[in-house]
Amino acid sequence: MKRFKRILATMLALVCVLAVFPTMEAEAGIVTVNGGCTTRATAYNWGAYSTTNSITVVLPENEDDFWVKFTLPKDKRVYARCSYSNENESMYIEMRNSSNVLLDAKYSPEDVLDMDTVIPFMALACDNLTASTQTYYIRVNRGTCSGTMYFTLSMNERIKTGRGTFTFSGTASNPGNSSISLSGVDSSVLSLNLTNNSTIPPGAIVTSVSTSGTQSPSQGNVHHMILPATESSIWYTSTYASATSGNYTINSTDSFAARQVWQFKYNALATAKSTMKSVKLTLAWEYDIANTGYKSY
């Protein structure tokens, strides 16, 4: 009876996972595999990477390992998600490449995420930064667990995107271009420290930058300027002239962290003095949820 209750509890947990698992849409392909994939040579062929296909595994009590292989296109950064229940404590999972090199490993219960929810899981990162599609293997080992085991595997994107708008305090002042320099005159500098801003994901990389502000009096031939001050000493000038807004050539290839000190000033050609207040910085970013405990911001 105790064994029946344990199996029933495990199956109920699995039903909860299937009901609320984020990648299992109505049209998703859910395949049940009843063991038999105990080595690399006999690995279940998952096929090409897809976020809509998942595997429900029934691992017989006389088998220690479950192996699965899949292909991943170039320039993809993904993760494999393995469901977990308390009955499976001591199980562990591994990610390996086609040369059997270990890429990532997670162990229960210490590496289990969302343990206090109905869908605890373990996650394995997989990066294909090569120039072609590659084959990868996942190995699930029962550890010291006894009896038949039940778990679900799925694949998910790791790279997410987001954006935020932040306000500089203070007012930038420009003395005016009294010498009528063709280079114009820069204003005073405003500074904004986003180093510990909790609304920005850890490790977020900037993909675009824009600014806005209110100049008084409003003038022509004004360029906003921005500096990612923690990582660079180079000021970026807006790609167009405007007293109210600026846009910049900064993108993900620059690898600037969103969480850093940003500085702002503006350049004016006009001879008259001016000020700019209500200056805002808008950042778009991408981030790897492997750096956030696999949580989205």
Locate predicted features.
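Acidic, Ser/Thr/Pro-rich low-complexity intrinsically disordered segments
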Residues: 59-124, 129-134, 141-142, 202, ...
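Noncatalytic modules at the cell exterior or secretory-pathway interfaces
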Residues: 126-145, 252-273
